[in-house]
Amino acid sequence: MAMIGYVARVLTGVRFKKMNHMIDVVHQKCGQNKVRTFFDMLWCAVRYGAGYYDYTMFGFYDMTGAQRDTYLTRVRNKKVSNIMNDMAHDDDFDDKLLFNVRFAKYLRRPTLNGETATPEQMAQFLEGQEAIFAKINHGSCGNGVEKLYVKDFESPAAMLDYIREKKLVVLEHVQAQHPDMARLHPQSVNTMRICTDLVDGQVHIAYITLKMGRGGGVCDNSGQGGILCRVDIDTGKICSPATDDYFNVFDKHPDTGIPLVGYQLPMIEEAKALACQAALEIPEVGHVGWDMAIGPDGPAIIEGNDFPGTDLCQLAPFLSLIHISEP
């Protein structure tokens, strides 16, 4: 009954302006009649639990029913999370201040609580730093993240006033990057999303994707203009073109020109090991997406997501989670 209620909320919460935009995108991509697309989207919502964004970004408009049925859609993903994750532990991940305390040993960089910090603690935190990252405590998709430069503030106290006014109270030193990660897009901290599933005490890696910034932006999230691609779990090599939230496809990074497919990411085994270790910390939360940076000396977790989106591994240029072929 809870899942039926969730589906009903999804259907009744449709934002028709955004839905119309997705219908336009489908028409531009394949020429499909817009009325047909509208009703096909409704059918996919009922049959597969797919929202209009799922329909467009997964390429449902160009698939058979059997192929559509291999995808982890919005409603199905919610069901997975409900089965594998105890909601009593939501704040361990959704509250970034709490997460930074709970998983401190995996972060490998100093953090500070801007809500409680004194000017003296802020001054000590900023010592030797050119810039820091400041985030809102409950945010997603890269929203509410700023890179603050020390030179732009008269004093540590002035920066503290600013972050409290803007509610950017999750403070972190800028994570240094391995050269092979930085060269993809030097202005952003580029991260792997490593999704782990804890089943019967064993950690399994479901997928790995790579998120990269673009256009000089400091955020690698596709919701903030970044791009993403699939990574081979065994080799750590990029195994798909990149795409963005506007369904553009890139064989090379659009800014640095680096060819993507076949690019070897560094320290993949160390990154997988760290994700698997972190996955055991809260066994009541078995399905987690870990955003992992690779520093010069090893991996570091940026954050954990207890409701990891399915778009990161199933966008149209990628393979579905279950490969299926038909005669």
Ranges and model annotations:
Residues 292, 298-312:
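A short beta-strand motif that forms the metal-chelation/ATP-contact edge
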Residues 4-124, 140:
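Conserved N-proximal alpha/beta basic substrate-recognition cap immediately N-terminal to
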Residues 174-175, 179-185, 211-295:
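A long amphipathic alpha-helix within ATP-dependent nucleotide-binding catalytic cores
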Residues 320-327:
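Residue-level detector of conserved catalytic or cofactor/ligand-binding positions
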Residues 184, 190-197, 203-211, 219-221, ...:
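Beta-strand scaffold of nucleotide-dependent catalytic cores
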Residues 150, 198-202, 233-235, 295-298:
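Short acidic-glycine loop/turn motifs at beta-strand connectors
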Residues 217-220, 310-320:
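A short, polar/charged loop-to-alpha-helix boundary motif
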Residues 83-201:
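Active-site nucleotide/adenylate-binding loops and adjacent lid/helix of ATP-dependent enzymes
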